């Protein structure tokens, strides 16, 4: 095993000039309430997505903790789903190139992996690195998703009104990328979508849409989200039917709506200072969600 971060990845020598591109990262393995990050990633990868860099998964992946799938066909093994951690080249609706780091979150060597990402950013001339998150929070599905933005320089999101104070949550490799690269002078952003707690284990494309729209607003990319909009419309109708069929859910949603509307009216924005969960409450919700995921595995 090498200690040189450059040995953790292979970079395509035939890649085009990507100077000034944005790098998004959506690693599997951390909190993804409502599968919002997975849905956003799938939307981005739906078209042509050639790989420009591959990471050495054998050094980073714990195969016994997250076992890959093998396929058996009658009397022989027919296929193996090899874990892949790679940087894909994508284009927006204006044919502007951007990059997406996707795959399993490393189980080991986080610092070396983060240093390797920093090297890639330097080699490729990336101008900004953006990570996506989705976490459970006491908001209703019937109101706009109150996106949370954070980053290395306040100038990157000067129009955003921060409402969280100090908070401690379980770390992720994606968060470490934002922290280490930001400390090194690289522009980094994190965009997070709160998801209603009653939808945390389901698919909630509304949150995925909110993430991608915020990416566009912060980076200037014109992302095609039309397919996700179609899915979201049908999903919201199904959620509304399920809620209306349950007195308990109906009461919960109504209570969350009152809380949300009171907060929004007080601050004239989707996120206000008094009535949403405190940092401690949010941290507790994240801990509970992670514990539920671990039990599910």
Mark where each language-model region is.
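N-terminal short beta-loop-beta anion/metal-coordinating cradle
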Residues: 2-103
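Short acidic, glycine/Ser/Thr-rich loop/turn "cap" segments at secondary-structure junctions
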Residues: 99-104, 159-163
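Internal, conserved structured core segments that host functional sites
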Residues: 96, 104-155, 177
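A conserved C-terminal secondary-structure "cap"
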Residues: 199-297
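Hydrophobic/aromatic beta-strand patches that form the interior of the parallel beta-sheet core
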Residues: 53, 99-101, 130, 187-192
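Conserved active-site and cofactor/substrate-binding residues in soluble primary-metabolism enzymes
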Residues: 35-39, 108, 112, 172, ...
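Catalytic cores of processing enzymes, dominated by hydrolases/peptidases
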Residues: 138-218, 222
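Predominant activation on well-ordered alpha-helical scaffold segments within soluble catalytic domains
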Residues: 38-45, 118, 174-178, 182, ...
């Amino acid at each position: 095993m090498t200690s040189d971060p450059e040995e953790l990845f292979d970079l395509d020598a035939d890649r085009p000039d990507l100077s000034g591109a944005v790098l998004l990262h959506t690693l599997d393995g951390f909190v993804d309430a409502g599968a919002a990050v997975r849905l956003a990633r799938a939307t981005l990868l739906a078209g042509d997505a050639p790989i420009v860099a591959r990471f050495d998964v054998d050094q980073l992946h714990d195969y016994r903790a997250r076992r890959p799938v093998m396929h058996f066909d009658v009397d022989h093994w027919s296929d193996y789903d090899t874990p892949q951690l790679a940087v894909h080249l994508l284009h927006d609706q204006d044919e502007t190139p951007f990059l997406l780091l996707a795959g399993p979150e490393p189980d080991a060597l986080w610092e070396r992996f983060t240093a390797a990402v920093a090297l890639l950013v330097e080699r490729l001339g990336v101008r900004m690195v953006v990570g996506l998150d989705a976490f459970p929070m006491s908001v209703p599905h019937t109101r706009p998703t109150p996106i949370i933005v954070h980053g290395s320089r306040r100038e990157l999101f000067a129009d955003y009104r921060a409402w969280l104070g100090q908070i401690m949550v379980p770390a992720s490799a994606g968060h470490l990328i934002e922290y280490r690269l930001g400390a090194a002078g690289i522009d980094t952003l994190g965009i997070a979508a709160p998801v209603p707690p009653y939808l945390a284990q389901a698919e909630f494309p509304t949150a995925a849409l909110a993430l991608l729209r915020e990416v566009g607003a912060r980076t200037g990319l014109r992302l095609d989200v039309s397919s996700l909009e179609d899915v979201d419309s049908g999903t919201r109708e199904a959620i509304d039917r399920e809620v209306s069929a349950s007195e308990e859910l109906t009461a919960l949603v109504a209570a969350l709506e009152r809380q949300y509307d009171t907060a929004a009216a007080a601050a004239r924005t989707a996120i206000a200072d008094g009535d949403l969960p405190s940092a401690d409450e949010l941290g507790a919700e994240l801990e509970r969600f992670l514990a539920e995921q671990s039990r599910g595995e």
